[in-house]
Amino acid sequence: MAKRVAGSKRYVHPLPIEPVVLPPLIAHNPLSWVYWVLAYVTSSNQLPRKIPLEVGADGRYTVTGREQMQYLWEHGFFGTGQLSRSEPTWQARTVDRLQLDTEGIAGHKLEQVTQLRRKQRLEFKRERASFERKRLELRRQGVLESEILEQERLWLKQLRDRELQWEASTGDPSPVRAEDAEIIAEDGASVLPIEKLELMPVEALFLTLALPVLHADAPAILARTLGPQPALPQIERLCRLYAAYHHYRSHGWCVRSGIKFGCDFLLYRRGPPFHHAEFSVMVLAPDERHDYTWYSTVARVVGGAQKTLVLAYVARRAAADQLAALWHARRYMEAFALFEVHELVYRRWLPGKNRE
């Protein structure tokens, strides 16, 4: 119960827009009216600075910065941590695993632990640089790649043996492994912020076009997603996905990626910390046809996770020429508005369970 109450306080806002809280108004007090009007005129619920979006060459849309990632997660559960299951908690988990917090390791002071980690990190870097020079020299001499790999395995084994010797001499496990040396910051008390929050293309569009949250260019996002000259079927597919995403977000659902369960979206009533997703959404065109095996396969995967399969048929209400004209004119929100969503729930009928 305490965990749920703490989560309710943390995840108050379902979207990255915080409503303005106006002061109480006392009708018979003129100063109260003046203060209320002043607060109403001067207040704003817009972010002081938009969150920058990075568009990678591989088509990934990421947000960096711990505060920005936490803000998007706590205000609507947007994105997924690249090194986490959902919420970007890799940095906190790694700090806890390496015992880099202020409490430190039992029996050691924080300053001593920091100095020891810095010393081991520098030693590892020197060893690695020496081996890189040795490997380059072997390649220049024409040594086979298999022999170079064998030398590398031997070097790693020697490095591990030194760590074991250190553990045996001190009676305490080494605070830094070779694979952790590069992620520890120079101060030795934190790790490098290498985790990013990855957004779906429809999430990036929603936070750019529908909500003024991301500092991004919508044409750049679409060009990276569809290519410089997309065909009409590609445009329609993206429009259907965005229309479905916007439709469920506007109705208060928390929409997450459904790739884990072989569908397009997952629908949560509040979000992952509170309940499991109840519905899995598959976005389809009205004229899209599949055989029974396809529907049965999707339903079996979704049903195995105790979820209900929703077939969202997104229909275009205007001619294709009108959609193409709006798209080339970069009037994207008007193009998305040409689509409407119709849902159909797919359930397996079992004689033993559905008999009434």
Curated annotation (Swiss-Prot):
Disulfide bonds: none annotated. It comes from the Eukaryota. One of its GO terms (cellular component) is cytoplasm. Its EC number is 4.6.1.16. SUPFAM superfamilies: tRNA-intron endonuclease catalytic domain-like. The active site is at residues 268, 276, 307. One of its GO terms (molecular function) is nucleic acid binding. It catalyses: pretRNA = a 3'-half-tRNA molecule with a 5'-OH end + a 5'-half-tRNA molecule with a 2',3'-cyclic phosphate end + an intron with a 2',3'-cyclic phosphate and a 5'-hydroxyl terminus. GO terms for biological process: tRNA processing; tRNA-type intron splice site recognition and cleavage. Keywords: Lyase, tRNA processing. It is an enzyme of class 4 (lyase). Constitutes one of the two catalytic subunit of the tRNA-splicing endonuclease complex, a complex responsible for identification and cleavage of the splice sites in pre-tRNA. It cleaves pre-tRNA at the 5'- and 3'-splice sites to release the intron. The products are an intron and two tRNA half-molecules bearing 2',3'-cyclic phosphate and 5'-OH termini. There are no conserved sequences at the splice sites, but the intron is invariably located at the same site in the gene, placing the splice sites an invariant distance from the constant structural features of the tRNA body. Belongs to the tRNA-intron endonuclease family. Heterotetramer composed of SEN2, SEN15, SEN34 and SEN54. Interacts directly with SEN54. This is tRNA-splicing endonuclease subunit SEN2. The lineage of its organism: Eukaryota, Fungi, Dikarya, Ascomycota, Saccharomycotina. The gene is SEN2.
